Amino acid sequence: MTHSSQDAGSHGIQEEGRLYVVDSINDLNKLSLCPMESQHLFSLEDKIPNAGTAPGNGRRGLFFVGLLLVLTVSLALVFFAIFLIIQTGNQMEDVSRRLTAEGKDIDDLKKINNMIVKRLNQLDSEQN
């Protein structure tokens, strides 16, 4: 049983060695150090599928672009909502300041009105 596991391990090492040899030959072909006939013997590019041509990558890319667009729009809406909340708070502070200022003015007007009424009552009582 241990012999079969060693065979599997040595088989993997042999395959890695073959891939290394093929890769080295391809590198030599790229440098034009090998004859032209050997260029087509060990082409890994033909055996390994291109990751960009797998079916569904277009949909996946479109999905991620759509997701990115939705996240960007939602982030913009959140910032807009925060901006509106801050603006509303500032306007409420302005209104409350005006109301307190007008309240003081109204109190002053009431005092002046009371003084005028008292003075008119005094003048009316003096005339009678």
Swiss-Prot record:
Its main location: membrane. InterPro entries: DUF4577 (IPR028099). One of its GO terms (cellular component) is membrane. Keywords: Coiled coil, Membrane, Phosphoprotein, Transmembrane, Transmembrane helix. It is found in: Membrane. It is a single-pass membrane protein. Residues 90-111 form a coiled coil. It comes from the Eukaryota. This is Leucine-rich single-pass membrane protein 1. It comes from Mus musculus. The lineage of its organism: Eukaryota, Metazoa, Chordata, Craniata, Vertebrata. The gene is Lsmem1.
